[in-house]
């Protein structure tokens, strides 16, 4: 007999950034996967290829009972039936209060972030730090009366807050310190770490005693992914067979790649646990024991199955029809390509462009970077539902199907 799915009752949930990559998947799960039942919002996949046939997600993730609202800067795209959508600016108190008065959320899930690849420091700080603080204080009742009380606030941080972008990380847990200031070479990660500190410090400190937590996903990929999956397949499409045989480093470096649906699931579990904690506090009971505590805590979120970096890259290429056999691989030294990347960055920088090979790409292709998610498994009840290979099948299938649809529209 099929296993009975648990039910998560979450009340009124406001997903901030709900039209983005992760946010869309959170909304889809909250609404019990209209993407699998409504043809108008179905995720495309290649037809007639069993490699892209996967079990239904709705049969495996919990059923949710929630009133779902979405706040994003622009909500014209990536909509799902069953949710209410609001255009808003998290850096504007006035904009947020107007939306909160309509939604009256019990839970805020904050996924909105400035794009890490833009490199605009002013924008990164304005959105990731100042915007998070404004949203947090509006939700907690410190910035005006919106006629309700938000009970729980879940913040999407990043596993990169524990990483200096250079060192190898092996099974790192939440005891590892945040990498801040001069030690942090990536400004995006510094802003995410600062925002995380603000969110966790705000736990039970607001007029409404709202409880908070932060989740740190590592290497998110999946349908609608515009970073890892898209760029790996873009490279496969443009590169010659000779270039595809080139491997940066020795491929002994394990790396975390986490399916976006599992990350979305962790957010719903966190919201559910926070609501349970808030109920305890409101009823006068003592809070959870330290080793069970969710509020005021940060959690690493992974697929609990690190993979060799080039194995998953070549697996993605193979799904797209670009197969590179192990005996065809040419191993190139990181010590050689790092300086080459630096030279290319300098040359391309003179004409205002970014080369395809940079020092960052070389380092990330060669480093070991994986985390422990034991804390999330124990305290949130988290366990990845979709495996890394299935997630890759879903992610690659989506990109290939979208490309086919776009070609058909153009009449090519």
Swiss-Prot record:
GO cellular component, one term: endoplasmic reticulum
Main location class: endoplasmic reticulum
Top EC category: oxidoreductase
Positions annotated to bind NADP(+): 17-23, 89-90, 111-113, 188, 192, 217-220
Alphabetically ordered keywords of this record: Endoplasmic reticulum, Lipid biosynthesis, Lipid metabolism, Membrane, NAD, NADP, Oxidoreductase, Steroid biosynthesis
UniProt pathway: Steroid metabolism; ergosterol biosynthesis
InterPro entries assigned to the protein according to its UniProt record, in alphabetical order: 3Beta_OHSteriod_DH/Estase (IPR002225), Lipid_A_modif_metabolic_enz (IPR050177), NAD(P)-bd_dom_sf (IPR036291)
GO terms for biological process, alphabetical: ergosterol biosynthetic process
Catalytic site: 192
Binding residue positions for substrate: 158, 188
Membrane association type: Peripheral membrane protein
Signal peptide: none
Enzyme Commission number, as recorded: 1.1.1.-
GO molecular function: 3-beta-hydroxysteroid dehydrogenase [NAD(P)+]/C4-decarboxylase activity
Cellular location(s): Endoplasmic reticulum membrane
Function summary: Sterol-C4-methyl oxidase; part of the third module of ergosterol biosynthesis pathway that includes the late steps of the pathway. The third module or late pathway involves the ergosterol synthesis itself through consecutive reactions that mainly occur in the endoplasmic reticulum (ER) membrane.
Subunit comment: Heterotetramer of erg25, erg26, erg27 and erg28. Erg28 acts as a scaffold to tether erg27 and other 4,4-demethylation-related enzymes, forming a demethylation enzyme complex, in the endoplasmic reticulum.
Note: In Aspergillus, the biosynthesis pathway of the sterol precursors leading to the prevalent sterol ergosterol differs from yeast. The ring system of lanosterol in S.cerevisiae is firstly demethylised in three enzymatic steps leading to the intermediate zymosterol and secondly a methyl group is added to zymosterol by the sterol 24-C-methyltransferase to form fecosterol. In Aspergillus, lanosterol is firstly transmethylated by the sterol 24-C-methyltransferase leading to the intermediate eburicol and secondly demethylated in three steps to form fecosterol.
Family (UniProt): Belongs to the 3-beta-HSD family.
Name of this chain's protein: Sterol-4-alpha-carboxylate 3-dehydrogenase erg26, decarboxylating
UniProt lineage: Eukaryota, Fungi, Dikarya, Ascomycota, Pezizomycotina
Gene that specifies this protein: erg26
